[in-house]
Amino acid sequence: SIAQLKHLGLATGIYPLLDVVVERADSAFVQVALADTDRRVGEGKPVAPSFLLACVLWADVREGWAARLARKDHPYPALQDAIDEVFDARIGDVSGRGKLAADMREIWMMQPRFEKRVGSVPFGLVEQPRCRAGFDFLRLRADIQEVDERLADWWQEFSMASDAEREDLVQAA
């Protein structure tokens, strides 16, 4: 646990990304992500380091994205630029950055797509290999009221629905 690492004096300086985890451990989003990780481990489910790192670094990405949107940048390029900035500042040349970066980027880039519940967007998104990770991330955001709970509920229902039910959900959105 983070508290135990702090108690042992091992909480900082070993690995730069661990420093970020410790630094963010008190934030609501990181707390719900860590609690969800503990739950998954307790249930014997796998935990992807990229998902946890995406949660820890989300505040940086969100701030950079918001700043770019305030300058009237287009949403997707603004998010891409914010992600690149965070990778350069926080991850650097960490071994495995390629896979970590790809997984994290995919989770983050799905977030604005979840807002679009019309047309073909939901059907394409739900077929993405990392859609479940993106949805789990969205659910954590809803848990701390960063996004509307109804949005996460809609996607939960959509992901489990038949094709006909999905059509109805899109029509109702």
Predicted features along the sequence, with ranges:
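Conserved, hydrophobic alpha-helical core segments of structured domains
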Residues: 1-170
